[in-house]
Amino acid sequence: MIHKFKLGGFNALLDVNSGGVHIIDDLTYDLLDNVEPPFEEKCPEDVVRKLSKMYDSKDIEDCYEEIVSLYNDKILFSEDDYEKYALSAVASPIKAMCLHIAHDCNLRCKYCFASTGDFGQGRMLMDYETGKRAIDFLIERSGDGKFLEVDFFGGEPSLNFGTVEKLVEYARSQEEPHNKKFRFTVTTNGVHLTDEMIDFINKEMYNVVLSIDGRKEVNDRMRVRVDGSGSYDRIIPNFKKLVEKRPKNKDWYVRGTYTKYNLDFSNDVMHLYDLGFDQISVEPVMADPSEPYAITEADLPRIFKEYEILSEKIQKIRDEGKFINFFHFMIDLDQGPCAIKRLRGCGSGNEYVSVTPDGDIYPCHQFVGITEFKMGNLYDGTFNEEMKDMFAHAHVYNKPECKKCWAKFYCSGGCNANNYIYAGDIHNAHKLSCQIQKKRLECAIMMKAVKMLDSAE
């Protein structure tokens, strides 16, 4: 399988199974529209006749021979070596957990998938005992795995920060007895951050996610406080302070959401960069199409163009010798990550689960509140192994649309929650998400290919 596209004045060709990327000329691009394996010894006469209106016949024949040579060398149309790994996609030890430390929030974001923080379950905070049981559950279910991840999530975790501190202390106390090493992450809207919280986060948290949508008018349209006022002016000083004090060996990024109201989101990325934030993630809102802020199919041409604009802006910054990292343009063309991760992505419901303040267990934070996906409870000791096994097998070869898609090894089958919520089944591709993901991948592939081309010259 191959995928080719035009972008930024270049023609790109991706060999899907090997991950090889090539910059090709117009003749090769057009010829590949007309030939595919199994190849004849010579270029078919009807193809030569068709393309000779635009290209020299000898050039067409030479180009065909080169394509066949690359095919014989397993560089183009390479065989799928990944499907065999799908047989290894069995239920795995749990190694990561999203801990819903607070089902409450001090913001009322209009697009919030979590019903403004309580996930439709009533506002509550996780107590220490529930959090402790969750840590014990993770240790018990992790098998021989040493590195465990805990994401403190909400709602807004800073509303229950004392419990966060106690649970970090408890988890650390369990590392040596169980030969484990915890890595903590916290996601915060920044409104309630104090200097003491910042110091604790920068000491204990392996990663921190800072939620902001970009320009003041964009952020404050959707990310409002309980009284309806904006949050931008309150959070910017807090985020700047946290990032300035953060150790260089620890991760962080600002994470935004764009909606129909700011389809010029490249300006929000650049605004965040100009504020001093060079680790940036901005994602499309996922919402019911009836919502006024929802992104629909009609918005895709504008969104695609905006990603192209963003890639040009980022490339300009890098050409000036400066650093910026946009998470959705990060791509590994060197056969990484591991095969199983390429096939089933984040591991929700299998290697990763979420725990609510009352001890309920779900496949991930976006499934919380969907009764049919409740996997168990920490207090009654239940856990649905059959559901865990179902998620373990929810890889790209068991998703009909994904199996034949060129992007499958990069999106890994997409978000299971979005697939269920918007396409009716975790095995069904959510087409809107897919199309946006493919465009981001094309931009990322082209940026990487052009960089390699420049390095070779």
Q: How does the language model describe each region?
A:
Residues 1-36:
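Acidic, low-complexity/disordered tracts enriched in E/D and polar residues
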Residues 39-55:
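Short acidic, hydrophobic short linear motifs in intrinsically disordered regions
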Residues 55, 61-199, 203-204:
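Conserved alpha-helical substructure of the radical SAM core
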Residues 135-153, 393, 429-457:
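Short Fe-S-cluster ligation motifs
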Residues 198-216, 278-286:
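Non-cysteine beta-strand/loop elements that form the S-adenosyl-L-methionine
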Residues 217, 221-233, 240, 244-348:
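Radical SAM enzyme [4Fe-4S]-AdoMet core and its adjacent flexible, acidic
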Residues 301-335, 365-412:
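C-terminal accessory region of radical SAM enzymes
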Residues 392, 396-443:
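Cysteine-cluster motifs in flexible loop/terminal segments that predominantly coordinate metals
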